[in-house]
C-alpha cells in the first residue's frame, strides 16, 4: 500500500482581501464547496488525505470592518487585535497564528496551500505553482519565493515541504461565484 500524502489548505487568513467589503467570505464558501465535494467523492482523493481550514480568520470574515494593513484600526484583513495573521509567522503574536501553526504541525502535511484573493498569481514552490496556475488560469508565478513572515515561508523553512500561496484572479473566478 502506498504511503498516504496529506494536502493542507487554509482559506481566508485575511478576513478581507482587496476586492470588496467582506470578500473573504467568498474564499470560505469556496473551501466549503471543496469539503462538500470530497465528502461525497472520497474515492477521488485516492492516496491523499485532505485537510481544509475554511476560515483561518473568522473574526475578520464575520465582524471585520476594513482591509487595512496592520495598524490600530485594522480589523477585517487583520484580527480583532489588529494583527495580520499572514505576516505573523515569526513572532506568532496572534492566538490565531499559533493555533494554525500548531494544527498544521499536528497534521504533518506533505503539501501546503494558503488560499487568498485577488492578485492572479502563485507564490512559492515552483512545481505547485505550475500545477495551480495551469488549473486556475493564473497569470503570474513567483517561483521559489517564500517571505519569512508569511505562512508559506514558515511552512517551507520549518516543515521542509512544498508550499504555495494561491491568489485567485477575482472573486468571480472561484467556482462558488460562477
Protein language model features and the residues they cover:
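Active-site-adjacent mobile loop/cap segments within catalytic or ligand-binding domains
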Residues: 124, 144-178
Amino acid at each position: 500500500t502506498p504511503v498516504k500524502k496529506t494536502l493542507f489548505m487554509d482559506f481566508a487568513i485575511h478576513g478581507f482581501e482587496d476586492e470588496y467589503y467582506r470578500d473573504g467570505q467568498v474564499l470560505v464558501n469556496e473551501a466549503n464547496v471543496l469539503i462538500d465535494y470530497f465528502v461525497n467523492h472520497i474515492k477521488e482523493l485516492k492516496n491523499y488525505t485532505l485537510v481544509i481550514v475554511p476560515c483561518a480568520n473568522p473574526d475578520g470574515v464575520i465582524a471585520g470592518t476594513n482591509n487595512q494593513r496592520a495598524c490600530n484600526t485594522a480589523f477585517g484583513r487583520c484580527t480583532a487585535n489588529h494583527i495580520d495573521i499572514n505576516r505573523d509567522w515569526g513572532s506568532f503574536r496572534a492566538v490565531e497564528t499559533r493555533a494554525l501553526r500548531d494544527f498544521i504541525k499536528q497534521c504533518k502535511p506533505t503539501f501546503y496551500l494558503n488560499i487568498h484573493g485577488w492578485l492572479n498569481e502563485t507564490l512559492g514552490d515552483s512545481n505547485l505553482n505550475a500545477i495551480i496556475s495551469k488549473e486556475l488560469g493564473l497569470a503570474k508565478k513567483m517561483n521559489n519565493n517564500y517571505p519569512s513572515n508569511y505562512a508559506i515561508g514558515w511552512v517551507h523553512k520549518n516543515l521542509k515541504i512544498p508550499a504555495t500561496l494561491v491568489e485567485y484572479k477575482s472573486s468571480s473566478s472561484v467556482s462558488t461565484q460562477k
